Amino acid sequence: VYSALKRLLVGRPIATSELEHQRLRKLVALPTFSSDALSSTAYATEEILFVVAAGTSSLALGLSRLVPISIVVAILLTIVVLSYRQTIYAYPHGGSSYVVSRENLGSKASLVAGASILVDYVLTVAVSISAGVAAIVSLPAFRGWADQRVTIGLCLIGLITLANLRGMKESGTLFAFPTYLYIVTVAGMVLYGLYQIYFGDDVGRIPFDAEQAEIQREAGGSLGLFLLLRGFSSGAVALTGVEAIADGVPAFRKPQSRNAAITMMAMAGILGSLFFGVSVLAHHIHPVPSHDETVISQIGRTVFGEGPIYVILQLATVAILTLAANTAYADFPRLSSIIARDGFLPRYLGNRGDRLVFSNGIIILAVAASLLIIAFGGITTALIPLYAVGVFTSFTLSQTGMVVHHRRVREPGWKLGLAISALGATATFIVLLIVAITKFTVGAWVPLVVVPTIIALFSAIKRHYTRVAQALEIKPEEVRPQPFNHTVVVLVGRIHRGVIQALGYARSLRPQHLVALYISHEDDDREEIQRQWREFGINVDLEIVHSKYRELTTPVIEYLEELDQRWNNDTITVVVPEFVVGKWYEQLLHNQSALLLKGRLLFRAGTVVTSVPYHVEGYGIVPSVQPKASAAVSPNGAGDTGAKPPKDADPPDRAADTPPAAR
């Protein structure tokens, strides 16, 4: 049932040899890796206005500062993109901030970069989905759904998670159309709106109360500068996601670096044009930032009216904001796999799933983003202050690493590259300080606490793997024959076919000592098992331990301790007879004592636990291992009694309800 459902939802497994065919051409890679950056045009202008035009009394001031702030953000975008373009060529196998920092700045810097960018990817999903839900509830037909933001957001995360579990190529193709639709509709809105403003009939303005605008202007001073810097730090979210292409170079078709560089420059041109165009329109149209309707919705409604083009704009906005999370879904699992291979994350994060994607990383990302959506109620503005700290930390470290790279490698034109990287590192570090200071009290403190915590977790995981490797390390001279004392203990309940097979298996191990152990709860149990043992003529020592609390695991462990003292064992093998019923739901009718016992014994040193399954199909019995002709076993492996179970022996399912042979 599980396998069939998995194939239906995720698709057929893909062979490793097909990995090359899963790589992306530029037209598909652009929406796959750029949807995060491009989608920020749907809320970056709004976030600037939310801060600088805090309330209607300062809207005029905010609008007067909007275009200059947007110009500065566009210049910063140009610097960062030019710097990352060099990273693409320098690191064709993936130039994430983590890799660049590790190669040039050392392990500690790479851990800071890795933790920061992982947090950023989680926030990318949470912010994009929250903004997408805001676009949905901005439509007049759906404004009554505003109180269902969290539920809608979780459903969207579920859908995009499922799409990514199906594989990079399928998800990229799926996401291409909505991304290009958004680009066309927003570009059309900007061009048509600007044409109407400068060459046609003025599109008009959204009314607002500007009575106290001069009061805000006159306030000036440090408060005015603080608001200006805070607004700039909010607008800087437009840069989130621009590094994704540099991270995902291995996903491009060959020549990978060239195709990735072309895609990044195209993304930067589109992003800068749309962001600046929306800001200019906002400057003329005077939208009022509100949680009830987004700024881009107000602009679109003013330019297009409430007709079908406006609806298409909103649907395209919802689509790209939802799909913007795909950038994080593409890069979070890949970065996690790199960090895992370095030993700082669990190694299973480095394994590809059936569809050649890092399934474990995808699932972890989905869970983390869902928790953020729930914690912050799906409100985009509440999540934004958390967003920029990780982004600009990774930007700064990556570009600082490229400065060191240029000085070390000194490739042709390295001085120009060094200058660009140094300028980028300086600019992004200044932005990081602005974000941390101006937004500390409204949420920027969270990543400043979470990132060091993740770094501590990285270090703890690395120490664990190092200790395990040291404990397992062995030298050639240590490998030599030595005495080995082996005892096998077979856990038995009532005698049935599974027990007989388990005894035969135990004999085949040829141990120095072989015993059968029965845990009794009542005196009648003791007498019954002794009677059966004599009746079947089993030539294996039977030892009976009474459990006064009717428990299985503790008496078994205490008995094993006694055997270690008695025979000075190197290893004890505990053989657990189990039967497997034909239908999965039939398993619910039987206790799970053997499973619990195996879990406890796993942590006992010098103990091996072996299950001997016996498959029951209907009223017939199909053994998983053909038993010996004789059921009788001697402790030293010699001599059989030839005894066989009688026809009136207990049926397997009745016998299995008596521990420890139950399953």
Residue ranges and their predicted role:
Residues 1-17, 467-663:
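Cytosolic C-terminal regulatory domains/tails of membrane transporters and channels
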